[in-house]
Amino acid sequence: MSGLARLRKTAFLMVSASANCRIQRYQSSRTEKHQDSTSANALLNHLIFKIKSTGPITVSEYMREVLTNPVKGYYMHHDMLGEHGDFVTSPELSQIFGELLGVWCISEWMSAGKPKSLQLVELGPGRGTLTDDLLRVFSNFGRLLNSCDISVHLVEVSPKLSDIQAQRLTGKAIEVELDKNSPVYKKGITKTGFPVCWYQDIQDVPTGFSFYIAHEFFDALPIHKLQKTKDGWREILIDIDPGIPDKLRFVLGPNVSLVANTFVQDDEPRDHVEVCPSAAVIIQKLANQINSYGGAALIADYGHMGERTDTFRGFRAHKLHDVLSNPGTADLTADVDFNFMRRIVGEAASCLGPVTQHEFLKNMGIDIRLKVLLEKSSDVAVQKQLIHGYNILMNADQMGQRFKFFSVVPQSRLKTTMPPVAGFSKLLMH
């Protein structure tokens, strides 16, 4: 049996360090309430004033204001995850999700020849649950990783979420440290003993052999919406409804879109496309870093291969929400165009996927891991929660088909003499 196969088989036999690691995500904490009507009106008034001053704004500018406005932005002051928030993510449902991603990282670290240092970088870490689960796996494989210098780097713009992450990962609050000579605004030591730093921008994360984890990160980046007309591509903008002065509406821009000229291909068959320049900048950065220093990026998100058109939508209290209604009180998202990502990466690195979440987790051995956890627990409530989390992660009408996994690896990684990348090939047990 190969070292990789032994690692993956061993992973399925891991026993949780404590009972509180056993899929009790819904009970972990309650999220805060939504902004009240006064807060929502404040952001709407800000947007209306901006439009009156400078004219209609792009969907990209609207998303940036609604999600990350320093005063009233949706992400800036809210814990929106979990049963009582606006959406639930895979790590909040089941510890197995994060454990398997941790095994994936170790598998790729071994395939790379066990480098002496490893940076775990998560983009948009949410409540810190996924990183926490990953680090627990690293600790469980402490003997294997003993000679590796591991550090954690979190890219987070939300003060509220960074506070929650710090509490979860280190067990205590960490004050913001503003140093003009350093891009790090928080730092500490995790409960598992690894140094952790927080950054506002991916560009500030140190170079080195790194695993970049982006779970439901790219779908929240601002998009431009473009419409094909007889006169060329026009950008869809957001303006004030002339009939209802406190309401916003979509309008078609009057001029040829510069964004379209840059990012839309001449043979684009769709009449409506969504383009994310921010995603292009980030994925290109990751590809260059990975090919130069080693490591990989693992991206999990809603997505497609360039066939979908209008995917811009809002979520509030687990239900679809009008994207232009009460800005700042709902999450805004758009599906990731993985074909666009592949095109941007180009020859800088190699891409794998997308494959469905069901396929990826199946290939990583989720069924075996579930069986082990069920056998190890005599608590009926824990067993039910394990099965409930598994079903949501895997079922086609839940997350199993909707979420996709996509990876960027060094060009050298796909040489035929190397073992296949875990998760993107069928699991073979010997």
UniProtKB/Swiss-Prot annotation:
Residues 1-31 form a transit peptide. PANTHER family: PROTEIN ARGININE METHYLTRANSFERASE NDUFAF7, MITOCHONDRIAL. Keywords: Methyltransferase, Mitochondrion, Transferase, Transit peptide. Arginine methyltransferase involved in the assembly or stability of mitochondrial NADH:ubiquinone oxidoreductase complex (complex I). Acts by mediating symmetric dimethylation of 'Arg-118' of ndufs2 after it assembles into the complex I, stabilizing the early intermediate complex. It comes from Xenopus tropicalis (Western clawed frog). Its main location: mitochondrion. It comes from the Eukaryota. The gene is ndufaf7. GO terms for molecular function: protein-arginine omega-N symmetric methyltransferase activity. It catalyses: L-arginyl-[protein] + 2 S-adenosyl-L-methionine = N(omega),N(omega)'-dimethyl-L-arginyl-[protein] + 2 S-adenosyl-L-homocysteine + 2 H(+). Belongs to the NDUFAF7 family. It holds the Pfam family Methyltransf_28. One of its GO terms (cellular component) is mitochondrion. GO terms for biological process: mitochondrial respiratory chain complex I assembly; peptidyl-arginine methylation, to symmetrical-dimethyl arginine. It is found in: Mitochondrion. It is an enzyme of class 2 (transferase). This is Protein arginine methyltransferase NDUFAF7, mitochondrial. SUPFAM superfamilies: S-adenosyl-L-methionine-dependent methyltransferases. Its EC number is 2.1.1.320.
